[in-house]
């Protein structure tokens, strides 16, 4: 299954078999977790496979609502749009796992750096370093994965429409060229299904905004924005559409924060 197809078929699985995945498959998972790309190359994002799921369950306690045999923990230092970049990285991992026939579920991460040091190797930063707070790595996202319980359907029916906003709520003034790409964004998962993304068309592509949300889920909302950008990126690659992500600034909009712009390179080439 291609990543673009996985976008339409994916769904969150909350019930897992206790059986661990095969060792050969686990090696494949670890390999793809080491092969990641993100938008801000100054960040130090890493994806850690925790094959002993009980470690995460113990640390999270009652907050661990999804019991799975394995988990993935994503760590990063703080930097420009680090949470959005985490979402961008992790959603591709999720879609690749789905393509391998594995169930997945995003979890809210309340773990701290000191919680995971015993089983995750994080870089040491001198506490006297003036940039200590921005350089130090910490966990920000968790993904449960494994084999789904027998009664759980791994994939969503291609004909079913998830509980999402209509496309006109996602983007204003849609060019038909972008319809399928933006629909891939529309069906992206988000914290509490808030779907915080809004795309505004401009002569060069799109300006992307995040709707302001409650402080209690602000971090997860930013991660959700990164997930939406990854869906946009995958769909563009599927249709051979040449784009780039840039932070070029845009007008302020009430109740929304500007994230970045998406430039249609094909349109700019035509202009030249």
Give each language-model segment a name.
Residues 1-272:
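Acidic, surface-exposed loops and disordered segments
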């Amino acid at each position: 299954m291609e990543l673009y197809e996985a976008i339409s078929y994916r769904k969150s699985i909350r019930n897992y078999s206790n059986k661990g995945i095969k060792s050969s498959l686990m090696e494949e998972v670890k390999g793809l977790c080491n092969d990641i790309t993100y938008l801000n190359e100054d960040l130090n994002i890493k994806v850690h496979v925790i094959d002993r799921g009980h470690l995460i369950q113990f640390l999270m306690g009652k907050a661990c609502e999804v019991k799975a045999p394995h988990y993935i923990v994503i760590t990063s230092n703080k930097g420009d749009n680090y949470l959005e970049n985490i979402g961008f990285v992790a959603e591709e991992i999720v879609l690749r796992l789905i393509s391998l026939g594995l169930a997945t579920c995003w979890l809210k991460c309340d773990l701290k750096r000191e919680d995971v040091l015993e089983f995750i190797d994080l870089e040491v930063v001198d506490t006297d370093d003036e940039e200590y707070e921005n350089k130090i790595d910490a966990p920000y996202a968790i993904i449960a994965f494994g084999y789904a319980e027998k009664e759980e359907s791994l994939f969503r029916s291609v004909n079913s429409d998830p509980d999402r906003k209509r496309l006109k709520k996602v983007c204003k003034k849609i060019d038909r060229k972008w319809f399928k790409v933006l629909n891939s964004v529309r069906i992206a998962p988000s914290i509490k299904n808030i779907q915080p993304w809004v795309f505004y068309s401009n002569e060069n592509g799109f300006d992307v905004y995040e709707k302001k949300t409650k402080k209690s889920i602000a971090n997860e909302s930013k991660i959700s924005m990164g997930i939406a950008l990854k869906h946009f990126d995958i769909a563009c690659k599927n249709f051979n559409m040449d784009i780039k992500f840039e932070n070029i600034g845009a007008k302020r909009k009430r109740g929304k924060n500007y994230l970045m712009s998406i430039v249609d390179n094909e349109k700019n080439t035509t202009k030249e």
